[in-house]
């Protein structure tokens, strides 16, 4: 069957701070990262800020997502595509402080628990620039060696703004 988007993060097994059991445990991932680093290789972690429909955030924090008047999720659209297996995060939610703290905690979890030093960020240009400035700034206070790589196929002006926000 259709397993959905690889960027539709989370399932009934957990969210952004978990691994799917079919892919191994957190301990397995830590071992992978350590072995790679022992060989002089850095593992770049994908940092995709959206959720699968069965992500725990959707049930526990519905205010972190945009909803249509009929109660259905306002899916991300990138014409001609409609990403109906991805629920975009609403960065300007009334509960934005708790949302942003959680997103910071996600990044710090992988840095501090698994020694991740490189993030490949999915479509950062589709999220508020001021969020990235804040998030990257907070992480760099404790972990100045962490790199943020922008996966952004966009105009040079936008890429320049992402660089100003802390992307490498």
Indicate residue ranges for each PLM-predicted region.
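Short beta-strand segments at enzyme active-site cores
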Residues: 1, 43-47, 120-121
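Surface-exposed intrinsically disordered loops and tails
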Residues: 3-9
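Alpha-amylase-like alpha-glycosidases and glucanotransferases acting on alpha-linked glucans and related
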Residues: 9-12, 19-23, 27-30, 34, ...
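Active-site beta->alpha N-cap acidic-glycine motif
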Residues: 16, 46-52
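Catalytic PLP-binding core of fold-type I/II PLP enzymes
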Residues: 37
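Hydrophobic beta-strand scaffold residues
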Residues: 40-43, 148
